[in-house]
Amino acid sequence: MTGSKTKKFKRPAFLDDIYRPEEKIGRFLWVLVLFGIAFGLKRGVQDNYLADIIIIKPFERGIVEFFRELPGLLLIFILALMYKFADSRVFKVGCALMAGGMAGLFITSSIITNNTGVLITKILVVLFMVLFSTGEHIIMPVRCTIAMELAKREKAGASLGITTSINQLGNIAGFLLVTGIFFLLGRIGYARTDIIGYRVVFGAGTALMVAAAMTAAALKETTLKAPRQRFYFAKKFTKYYILEVFYGSRKQIFLTFAPYVLILQYGADPSIMSILFAICAVFVMLCSPLIGKLIDKAGYKAVMIGDTLILIVVCLMYGFAHRLFSPGTAFIIVCINFILDQIISIASMANNVYVQRISSNPEEITATLSTGISVNHVFSVLIALLGGWIWSIAGIETLFTISAVLALINSIYAATIKKNEEVTSAA
């Protein structure tokens, strides 16, 4: 076709409806895709890698999680160090740190042999996990502000929905890739505990994260600089902060030790763990809007009470299934409860709605939720340490009984919330 002009890429109509016409959002969305897949790859093998290759025992797993969660606890101070940076630059820094962390895990896996329990190896792996976690936590808040800034003013919510869905789909793709990699390696004779599978996964994850960091580096610099939140405590939010303590403590037990139970107690390999993570991600995508509507219809208080009452059963089944059922049946029950925990945890949105209803303005909402995350992380890192010790001396039955008790206390405390606490003119 002589003389024809090169056609400029035209983005889909539904994106034109959401994003401002002058904004080039392709690169930003592409970064989220790459980041999502890389995260899915890492998350899909992380616990098996620690248990089967690095030989991290249950008590040590709590120590690992303590350090991995420290960036979340210190996030408010980390962001304060970058107070002169626009959000786009903070986003680029976060991507670079994640790429460095993933590359470190790949290099470490390339120089060690199978089933190593050497202390220096454990230290290196934890350091690179913390580096990745630091980048991940840095990205969390600015990703949302960038997504909203690129959108038309009245379409900020739709933009957040698009970016969240893209991230979840990337995670699912990463989980399924892990399953495929270990399935193929198994077919050609490699055992689940052979390090070759982890090298392939971390290598692929490194390539994706480096690509994500390079793509992010090409993003247009913006002047957008969201205010770096300070700690905000007000008496009317006391119940919210206490609820966050119970939620964070109970959730941390599941987040840290539930995968380890499946691996050490039931022999789940990376393929099984990745399939479970993928199923959880699909259910989270499908159930989030439904639970959101339930909160609006039934009220945040009813959801706060109901979800934690269900979680009591989930926790007890997780801790005692191997005592009550045959190994095969117990494994199925534990897998179902693993998925249920992920679904029910979506109901923590009710806590955010509670804050919105008793806040006087949007700034108060943002400051309170940010402080709540910090409070959550304080107790999360402590419960991670304590949980590993409890497992090592008293077993998983005691550990998950404590989780059930925390859920029960959460329900009882949520029942004390009164309707008259709400601010009728809340934003």
Mark where each language-model region is.
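Glycine-rich segments within core transmembrane alpha-helices of 12-TM secondary carriers
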Residues: G161-T179, I373-I383
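Hydrophobic core of transmembrane alpha-helices in multi-pass small-molecule transporters
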Residues: V33, G101, G117-I139, T329-I346
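C-terminal transmembrane helical hairpin of 12-TM major facilitator-type secondary transporters
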Residues: A302-S348
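Helix-to-loop junctions at the C-terminal end of transmembrane segments
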Residues: L75-S88, F182, C287-Y300, W391-S392
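Intracellular juxtamembrane helix-capping segments at the cytosolic ends
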Residues: Q46, I138-A151, I346-S360
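C-terminal membrane-cytosol helix-exit motif in multi-pass small-molecule transporters
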Residues: G205-K225, Y413-K418
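C-terminal ends and interior cores of transmembrane alpha-helices
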Residues: A96-V118, I310-P327
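Short amphipathic helix-loop junctions that connect adjacent transmembrane helices
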Residues: V45-E60, T256-M273, V355-R357
